[in-house]
């Protein structure tokens, strides 16, 4: 009767239910209940509404497309301001590396992983060419080697400032390295705020871009789907549960207890700045970016994203040819 996808299944479960009329259209419920409608994020409507119909709602926003940085390390390394271009980003990495070596420390500037790689690639793609920009903005990532090669080259440059052992790092490993002061930057979203030690002077920055035009991501991924069972009583009950999840009471708990950004526009972050200043500042940094794009899960198909993440580290360390990587991406 009610499915929670957790952000997965856009190209499988969701597509099947949409095509086979197995998902209930939620728009009639929103049209009849203004209070319910006011609890739904505009991002949900703009991305998921199709032909006037809406088959999913989510209780959280995904805010990312940037990185956490250790302000204390930045200061010690002589970085006076957050990088606004990729050249400045690489210069910051060089400064951190030089400072670390001079001080006899083992601090690495930044670590690319299979998990954060697509966020980085999407930001780089936006400034590669008009074709690549259109692909990102139109959520259709059919890219040629011409668009992908410059992105891979920049990612190789950034990778040189990470751990060269090519361990299969995950976001928790990155978080642990950041908390121990062994890495200066931590590519992740707002939701990672809860993972960062309070003793770290951690700030958030969107990705840099061409001519200083910064880039971040704000999305609503696939969430709850109400089954179109034909049983009006159970369908209505499922919708009541969605109303509950989007209520201010629950949305506030999501914010304060999980560190995720609630999707309801009724939650005003300025009211919580004293309680969760780090997260609030991170959200402000993302919303202050010059350009906002979707998160990778809303840009790439599930197969494309899996292929990208499974092979990106091989391409960056030189064990997989770039041309072959581009071919494999769409298989």
PLM feature segments, named:
Residues 1-4, 184-189:
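Paired acidic/hydrophobic, glycine-rich loop segments that form the ligand-binding mouth/hinge
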Residues 25-40, 81, 100-101, 109-110, ...:
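Short, solvent-exposed loop/beta-turn-alpha elements that line the ligand-binding surface or hinge
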Residues 92-94, 138-168:
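Glycine-centered hinge/linker elements that transmit conformational signals in sensory
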Residues 49-60, 65, 90-140:
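Extracytoplasmic/periplasmic solute-binding protein
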Residues 86-90, 166-179:
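Short helix-initiation/N-cap motifs at beta->coil->alpha
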Residues 76-77, 160-161, 197-261, 310:
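Extracytoplasmic/periplasmic substrate-recognition and gating elements
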Residues 8-64, 205, 274-276, 287:
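Hinge/lid segment of periplasmic solute-binding proteins
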Residues 205, 255-309, 313-314:
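Long, aromatic- and glycine/proline-rich binding clefts that accommodate carbohydrate-like moieties
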């Amino acid at each position: 009767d009610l499915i929670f996808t957790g952000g997965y299944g856009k190209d499988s479960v969701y597509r099947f239910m949409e095509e086979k009329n197995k998902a209930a259209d939620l728009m009639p419920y929103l049209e009849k209940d203004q209070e319910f409608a006011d609890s739904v994020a505009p991002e949900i409507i703009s991305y998921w509404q199709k032909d006037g119909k809406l088959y999913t709602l989510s209780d959280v926003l995904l805010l990312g497309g940037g990185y956490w940085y250790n302000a204390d390390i930045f200061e010690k390394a002589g970085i006076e301001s957050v990088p606004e271009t990729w050249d400045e980003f690489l210069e910051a990495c060089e400064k951190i590396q030089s400072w670390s070596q001079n001080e006899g420390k083992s601090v690495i500037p930044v670590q690319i992983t299979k998990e954060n790689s697509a966020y980085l690639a999407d930001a780089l793609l936006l400034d590669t060419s008009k074709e690549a920009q259109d692909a990102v903005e139109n959520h259709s990532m059919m890219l040629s080697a011409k668009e992908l090669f410059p992105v891979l080259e920049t990612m190789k440059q950034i990778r040189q400032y990470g751990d060269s052992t090519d361990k299969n790092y995950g976001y928790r490993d990155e978080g642990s390295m950041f908390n121990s002061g062994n890495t200066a930057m931590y590519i992740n979203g707002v939701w990672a705020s809860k993972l960062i030690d309070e003793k770290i002077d951690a700030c958030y920055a969107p990705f840099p871009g061409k001519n200083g035009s910064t880039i971040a991501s704000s999305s609503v991924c696939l969430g709850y789907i109400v089954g179109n069972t034909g049983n009006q009583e159970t369908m209505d009950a499922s919708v009541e549960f969605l109303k509950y999840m989007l209520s201010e009471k629950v949305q506030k708990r999501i914010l304060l207890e999980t560190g995720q950004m609630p999707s309801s526009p009724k939650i005003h972050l300025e009211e919580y700045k004293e309680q969760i200043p780090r997260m609030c500042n991170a959200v402000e940094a993302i919303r202050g970016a010059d350009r906002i794009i979707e998160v990778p899960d809303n840009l790439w198909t599930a197969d494309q994203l899996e292929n990208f993440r499974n092979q990106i580290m091989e391409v960056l360390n030189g064990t997989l040819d770039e041309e072959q990587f581009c071919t494999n991406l769409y298989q």
